[in-house]
Swiss-Prot record:
Family statement drawn from the similarity comment of this UniProt entry: Belongs to the IspD/TarI cytidylyltransferase family. IspD subfamily.
Keywords, in A-Z order: Isoprene biosynthesis, Nucleotidyltransferase, Transferase
Protein name: 2-C-methyl-D-erythritol 4-phosphate cytidylyltransferase
GN (gene name): ispD
PROSITE patterns assigned: ISPD (PS01295)
GO BP term (any one): isopentenyl diphosphate biosynthetic process, methylerythritol 4-phosphate pathway
Sites annotated Positions MEP for the nucleophilic attack: 159, 215
Entry-linked Pfam families: IspD
Length: 236
């Protein structure tokens, strides 16, 4: 049986670094909620069985009317961290018939620059891989190490062989669930899914991402994201 594709969008964060009282995923960009662009990209990929959005149980900002016409489901099962929200979402996918051998693509709600082309490139590259992998970009900038709380450069780090992780991150549902459970048992709260897979002893792959698929984090990022979303996506 051919494994099916599911998308999981953890959307339980508060976006404290974005400088807004409204969680960043609900901020308006180019006339639409930031989250809308992510949902629209996956909605355009009809090969996905379901897209599941994981909200915090007490989320009062989500308004389904802002996403009318898009195909997705919502569950209020967000946890205290990204790792916990993803785990709860993985467990929730069983409600839609997902099995351990099906693929899940976990994507940050705050990366509105994702496109159907990027999603399909990731799937086409990894669909026969025993582990899975992530969208990523080779590091282009020179990296400086600075002690926590200081401003003096301790040394320059080599950027050779370094990649900047993006999302979606694509893994088998069972493998990712078990990897996160193992990390939890061993007291680790990891910041992305690939880290959990690595912690479990597997080797994820990287697939070339795009600069447009950056994560909106700081106040100045909103203007940049709006400019990108207003421009044609081309082949990215």
């Amino acid at each position: 049986m051919t494994p099916r594709l599911f998308a999981l969008i953890p959307c339980a964060g508060t976006g404290s670094r974005s400088g807004s009282a409204v969680p960043k995923q609900y901020r308006t960009l180019a006339g639409r909620a930031l989250l809308h662009y992510t949902l629209a990209a996956f909605d355009a990929c009809s090969e996905f069985a379901q897209t599941l959005v994981v909200l915090a149980p007490d989320d009062t900002h989500f308004d389904a009317r802002r996403f009318a016409g898009l195909r997705f489901a919502v569950r209020r099962c967000g946890g205290g961290s990204r790792q916990a929200s993803v785990l709860n979402g993985l467990l929730g996918l069983a409600e839609f018939g997902a099995t351990d051998q099906d693929w899940v693509l976990v994507h940050d709600a705050a990366r509105p620059g994702i496109t159907p082309t990027l999603i399909r490139t990731l799937v086409a590259t990894l669909k026969d891989d025993p582990v899975g992998g992530i969208l990523a970009l080779p590091v282009a900038d020179t990296l400086k190490r600075v002690p926590t709380g200081g401003d003096a450069i301790a040394r320059t780090e080599s950027r050779d062989a370094l990649w900047q992780a993006q999302t979606p991150q694509m893994f088998r549902i069972g493998m990712l669930r078990d990897a996160i459970l193992r990390a939890q048992r061993e007291g680790h709260d990891l910041t992305d899914e690939a880290s959990a897979i690595e912690w479990a002893g597997h080797t994820p792959r990287v697939v070339q991402g795009s600069l447009r698929n950056f994560k909106v984090t700081y106040p100045e990022d909103f203007a940049l994201a709006e400019a990108i979303l207003a421009a044609p996506a081309h082949a990215s």
